[in-house]
């Protein structure tokens, strides 16, 4: 299904957004209408304290107050050099359809926490904020504001949990997948993770994130239908075990799918029966039909050794074009090890360690208040901590990326919102972790990393094609991100610097906060 068509289907929630329920469907209609999968009102997806604080602001007559919150993360999973920003489109769709229906209001009333004036106000609520964000698929680094919400205070508070849920999950999986794709060194990678995902949403949106991160396909059919991701798959051991013998299982499969026969060869013994029976199937079934055996899959054992032996046997049988697919608890480290040992593998099916990011399964993006609007003025706010990394970057700001003459990104830069730095000559940046140091750059190019994507609760552009987001990731990695930053171990540290004016403002706020404390 084309990506645009899928988007129109799965988010056809207009009736619900207006407080109406779709007409009841017959069982057959429920089976075929996939709009029902995502036609869910998730406005109540929040921590209780978000609603409790919103009620408090309402009682304090703060409905008209505005605030600014930044989304950023502090640490890249697996000790990586960068992360991939994913989940933005789901955030924008959530915000655009945010409302509270009768069932939501009735449940909130049952908690006996909130008064009727507030519940009546909620019944007519819509999100009216602005969102500034990096494009989805952007390379991002710790502590920089990848997304900013400028909104009425209550609006901005209510949406924290849902925003972080979507950004954290998809950014985690996209980042992990990209590591796996890099380890595969140009070989195809497929997402095989649905059955080990934490639930259906994690499988489906994890597949979306994996595709953004560079996976070529997914085995999850629902994700293919919803997002237009290419789907792929072979057979299970049960197919082989159900038939009288391995050869019969292979023969029947090849007869049914002569153009896409990939045979699972490790049900009994890879080298003694699996590969020989695959070769026999190619010779006795496919070649007489004018077809070729597309591939074999090995799902257990010593993948490096077995793939080399299988390759030798296939080549000796004249099946040099037959591909070898490997699966079985793979990640970037096992894939790299297999290839370092000379493993003859053309494609990897990666499951649980991709879809759950098993080695480091928490992304850790946060949502912090950085400014309060008082009339026409905007007062920056800062959170201090005993831990340097948890001191927030205050105020409304701009985020830039600096490039050398060859187009490689050398630093990111935070400036005050109203700054217009002159980058035509030499410019000194402050390293906030080592403020005695100055990074001086001259004759470099610079571009802003974020754009206004939502105004007054309405998106300003159509959702991009998922394949274009995926291509954007690849283009950045190929042309902007230093190979040294892409190392798995001890990657080069990407600088996040501050303009002198911004750093001065932050230090003044820190001093003021310390005096108040």
Indicate where each model-derived feature is located.
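Short, Lys/Arg-enriched N-terminal segments with co-localized hydrophobic residues
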Residues: 20-33
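Gly/Ser/Thr/Ala-enriched C-terminal appendages of enzymes
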Residues: 33-65, 69, 78-80, 317, ...
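Buried, small/hydrophobic-residue-enriched core segments of structured protein domains
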Residues: 33-66, 75-77, 113, 119-128, ...
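N-terminal, Lys/Arg-enriched amphipathic/low-complexity engagement segments
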Residues: 67-123
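Short beta-strand/loop segments at the ligand-binding rim of alpha/beta enzyme cores
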Residues: 316-326
């Amino acid at each position: 299904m084309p990506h645009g068509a899928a988007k129109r289907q799965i988010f056809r929630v207009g009736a619900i957004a207006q407080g109406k329920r779709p007409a009841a469907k017959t069982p057959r209609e429920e089976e075929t209408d996939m709009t029902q999968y995502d036609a869910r009102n998730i406005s109540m997806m929040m921590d209780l304290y978000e609603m409790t604080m919103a009620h408090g602001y309402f009682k304090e007559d703060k409905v008209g107050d505005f605030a600014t919150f930044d989304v950023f993360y502090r640490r890249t999973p697996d000790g990586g050099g960068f992360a991939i920003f994913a989940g933005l489109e789901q955030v924008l769709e959530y915000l655009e359809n945010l409302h509270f229906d009768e069932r939501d209001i009735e449940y909130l009333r049952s908690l006996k926490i909130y008064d009727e004036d507030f519940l009546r106000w909620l019944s007519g609520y819509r999100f009216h904020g602005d969102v500034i964000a990096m494009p989805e698929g952007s390379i991002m680094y710790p502590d920089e504001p990848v997304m900013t919400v400028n909104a009425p205070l209550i609006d901005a508070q209510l949406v924290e949990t849902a925003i972080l849920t979507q950004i954290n999950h998809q950014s985690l999986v996209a980042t992990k997948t990209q590591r796996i794709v890099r380890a595969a060194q140009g070989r195809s990678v497929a997402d095989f993770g649905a059955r080990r995902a934490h639930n259906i949403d994690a499988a489906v949106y994890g597949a979306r994130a994996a595709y953004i991160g560079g996976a070529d396909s997914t085995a999850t059919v629902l994700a293919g239908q919803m997002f237009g991701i290419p789907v792929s798959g072979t057979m299970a051991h049960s197919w082989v075990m159900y038939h009288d013998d391995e050869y019969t299982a292979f023969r029947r499969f090849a007869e049914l799918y002569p153009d896409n026969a990939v045979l699972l060869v490790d049900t009994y013994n890879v080298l003694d029966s699996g590969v020989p029976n695959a070769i026999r199937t190619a010779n006795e079934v496919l070649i007489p039909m004018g077809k070729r055996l597309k591939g074999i899959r090995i799902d257990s054992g010593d993948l490096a050794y077995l793939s080399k032996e299988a390759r030798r046997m296939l080549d000796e049988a004249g099946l040099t074009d037959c591909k070898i697919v490997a699966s079985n608890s793979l990640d970037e480290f096992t894939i790299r090890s297999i290839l370092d040992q000379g493993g003859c593998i053309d494609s990897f099916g990666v499951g649980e360690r991709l879809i759950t990011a098993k080695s480091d399964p928490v992304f850790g993006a946060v949502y912090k208040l950085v400014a309060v609007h008082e009339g026409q003025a905007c007062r920056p706010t800062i959170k201090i901590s005993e831990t340097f990394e948890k001191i927030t970057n205050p105020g409304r700001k701009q985020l830039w990326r600096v490039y050398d003459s060859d187009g490689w990104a050398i630093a990111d830069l935070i400036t005050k919102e109203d700054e217009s730095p002159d980058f035509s000559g030499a410019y000194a940046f402050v390293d906030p972790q080592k403020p005695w140091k100055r990074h001086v750059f001259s004759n470099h190019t610079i571009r802003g990393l974020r754009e206004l994507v939502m105004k007054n609760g309405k998106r300003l552009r159509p959702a991009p094609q998922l394949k274009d987001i995926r291509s954007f990731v690849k283009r950045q990695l190929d042309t902007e991100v230093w190979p040294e930053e892409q190392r798995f171990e001890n990657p080069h540290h990407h600088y996040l610097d501050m303009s002198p004016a911004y750093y001065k403002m932050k230090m003044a706020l820190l001093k003021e906060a310390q005096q108040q404390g």
